[in-house]
Amino acid sequence: MNAEIIAVGTELLLGQIANTNAQFLSEKLASIGINVYYHTVVGDNNKRLQQAIEVAEGRADMLIFTGGLGPTKDDLTKETIASSLAEELVYDEKALASISDYFKRTGREFTENNKKQALVLDGATVFANDHGMAPGMGLNKNGKVYILLPGPPKEMKPMYVSYVEPFLRNFTTGENIYSRVLRFFGIGESQLEVKVQDLIDGQTNPTIAPLANDGEVTLRLTAKHQNVDEAEKLIQHVEDLILERVGEFFYGYDQEFLHDKAIELLKKKGLTLSCAESLTGGLFGNQVTESAGVSSVFKGGVICYHNDVKQHVLHVPEEVLFTDGAVSKECARYLAENVKELLEADIGISFTGVAGPDASEHKEPGTVFVGLAIKDEPTVVFPLNLSGSRQQIRERSAKYGFYHLYKKLEEI
């Protein structure tokens, strides 16, 4: 079965609010085997909503509406659908009583327009609104399923979980959808695709969907099966094939992120970290401290933006700054080693480079050096050649720091 989500509300078209309902519903529907092929947004206009209904009926088995169930004149979803289906609107007694009780409790007048919220399509299954007034409803007619839900996410989401999903399962084959996200760093989307292109071209079940985002690449593997164990086997087989080719760039699954993975390894190995940041200006340290309980492994950092701080606090030799420059392999090495010693940590990591938009020390924007000093091991400096805006270069530099830290920790 395939569905179309139709969000109703002029405020969505004006960009005043984001359509988070569609994202939530798409994910939930996919998990029970209902394919969402279209998202539509239409304003509070009867004629245009009717046109959207007619288009959706021509290409979807299920039409899911969010918004337009309120008490005002521009809340016209129910009325338009009732007219389209030649159905009457009738009062749902439970909803009417619930709304009436609310107004009594709050000492407000229960006006006629508020009674409108208790109107439902005749013959529809009614979904109680435990967090608001207007109920939702579901109607199966003319070979189509119509679902009407309130617009506010705080009302729609719990209604979906408690009442709508159990109702929708009556229309599914029992075949569920299971997904796993593989996360990669240090390889571009096009490079990764080339290495697994034959797997993408031959995909059936599971499917493979690549996505690039802020210097990372993810592959979403999605399998359909009635049995979760069989779906896991399908996904695992394809994952194994992928990691045989690009496993060196793989670092985690689903909602795992680089900084969390690196800190997890620091805790596991009982090592402490310090950082010296020039071009990143504290971005790396900020991300470290986003993780709970990080005080056990993070000693602190030095923002050494000016050369005076590099020289007098972190003891980068004046000769290095004069000859090689602040943006250099040698400077990154001294920063990493000396911040480690200064803060008495097991590991020192450093960032120096040109964020742009202008060149510096005759070096182009995106020229970056990340230094990594771990205990008594030889210090390693990773040269980077990044592209993007000033902010993107800074953020990607910090990510590369976490990536190289994570990979190095895996080795020791």
UniProtKB/Swiss-Prot annotation:
SMART domains: MoCF_biosynth (SM00852). Signal peptide: none annotated. InterPro entries: CinA, CinA-like_C, CinA_C, CinA_KH, Competence-induced_CinA, MoaB/Mog-like_dom_sf, MoaB/Mog_dom. Belongs to the CinA family. This is Putative competence-damage inducible protein. It comes from Bacillus thuringiensis (strain Al Hakam). The lineage of its organism: Bacteria, Bacillati, Bacillota, Bacilli, Bacillales.
